[in-house]
Amino acid sequence: MDPNTVSSFQVDCFLWHVRKRVADQELGDAPFLDRLRRDQKSLRGRGSTLGLDIETATRAGKQIVERILKEESDEALKMTMASVPASRYLTDMTLEEMSRDWSMLIPKQKVAGPLCIRMDQAIMDKNIILKANFSVIFDRLETLILLRAFTEEGAIVGEISPLPSLPGHTDEDVKNAVGVLIGGLEWNDNTVRVSETLQRFAWRSSNENGRPPLTPKQKREMAGTIRSEV
């Protein structure tokens, strides 16, 4: 196993522990707490994949961080912070919409690269909007936290989320997954639109009808899978 993979996991475990202590002292805002929950799932998946114990990794990560901090001067820290571009966290969904449990009458799940797509095939003839919470850097989507599909009545009928066992994805991964989800929902005669915020930062455009430019392959992929199972 690559030693850098191990040390990266160890440091991530310790930093998650520090953030959890911050949350326990009620010092974290809603985006902070949301990322904390998502990262916990990701760390569990990575630990299982790597065969590493999280508690042991956390202790090792603490030693790595302490060693670095001991060698780090305040001036070097200021220079490092100044050179790192800051990302922004954008929210289409409220914390309640993100954390709400939902169920599917006819479940359909598909993995597209590092993202998992879920939708309810029982939903038909509905107006649906896709909302997402994500981070942005250089005016471009950096990391998808969660995307959900809502009916006009507020019911959740679809979702795109990062796979805990496969951390890291690109804006192209997100756009491809959105295309697949739209194709699946439209197969059942639903009308789907994407939030203006997601259009702006994923596609760098905003269409009045809420439709980003999708390739025929994206729209066929989920629809073709659904057709074969009906």
From Swiss-Prot:
Location of this chain's protein in the cell: Host nucleus; Host cytoplasm
Motif Nuclear export signal positions after renumbering to this chain: 137-146
CPSF4-binding: annotated span: 180-215
Region (Disordered): 205-230
Main location: host cell
GO cellular component, one term: host cell cytoplasm
GO molecular function: protein serine/threonine kinase inhibitor activity; RNA binding
Recorded superkingdom: Viruses
Keywords carried by this UniProt record: Eukaryotic host gene expression shutoff by virus, Host cytoplasm, Host gene expression shutoff by virus, Host mRNA suppression by virus, Host nucleus, Host-virus interaction, Inhibition of host innate immune response by virus, Inhibition of host interferon signaling pathway by virus, Inhibition of host PKR by virus, Inhibition of host pre-mRNA processing by virus, Inhibition of host RIG-I by virus, Inhibition of host RLR pathway by virus, Interferon antiviral system evasion, RNA-binding, Ubl conjugation, Viral immunoevasion
Region listing for PABPN1-binding, in residue ranges: 223-230
Start-end of Basic and acidic residues biased regions: 218-230
Chain spans, region RNA-binding and homodimerization: 1-73
GO biological process terms on file: symbiont-mediated suppression of host cytoplasmic pattern recognition receptor signaling pathway via inhibition of RIG-I activity; symbiont-mediated suppression of host gene expression; symbiont-mediated suppression of host mRNA processing; symbiont-mediated suppression of host PKR/eIFalpha signaling; symbiont-mediated suppression of host type I interferon-mediated signaling pathway
Modification comment: Upon interferon induction, ISGylated via host HERC5; this results in the impairment of NS1 interaction with RNA targets due to its inability to form homodimers and to interact with host EIF2AK2/PKR.
Chain positions of motif Nuclear localization signal: 34-38
Gene3D superfamilies, alphabetized: Influenza virus non-structural protein, effector domain, S15/NS1, RNA-binding
Chain segments annotated as coiled-coil in the UniProt record: none
Summary of the function given for this chain in its UniProt record: Inhibits post-transcriptional processing of cellular pre-mRNA, by binding and inhibiting two cellular proteins that are required for the 3'-end processing of cellular pre-mRNAs: the 30 kDa cleavage and polyadenylation specificity factor/CPSF4 and the poly(A)-binding protein 2/PABPN1. In turn, unprocessed 3' end pre-mRNAs accumulate in the host nucleus and are no longer exported to the cytoplasm. Cellular protein synthesis is thereby shut off very early after virus infection.
Assembly, per entry: Homodimer. Interacts with host TRIM25 (via coiled coil); this interaction specifically inhibits TRIM25 multimerization and TRIM25-mediated RIGI CARD ubiquitination. Interacts with human EIF2AK2/PKR, CPSF4, IVNS1ABP and PABPN1.
Domain notes: The dsRNA-binding region is required for suppression of RNA silencing.
Family to which this protein belongs: Belongs to the influenza A viruses NS1 family.
Protein name per the record: Non-structural protein 1
Native source organism of the sequence: Influenza A virus (strain A/Henry/1936 H1N1)
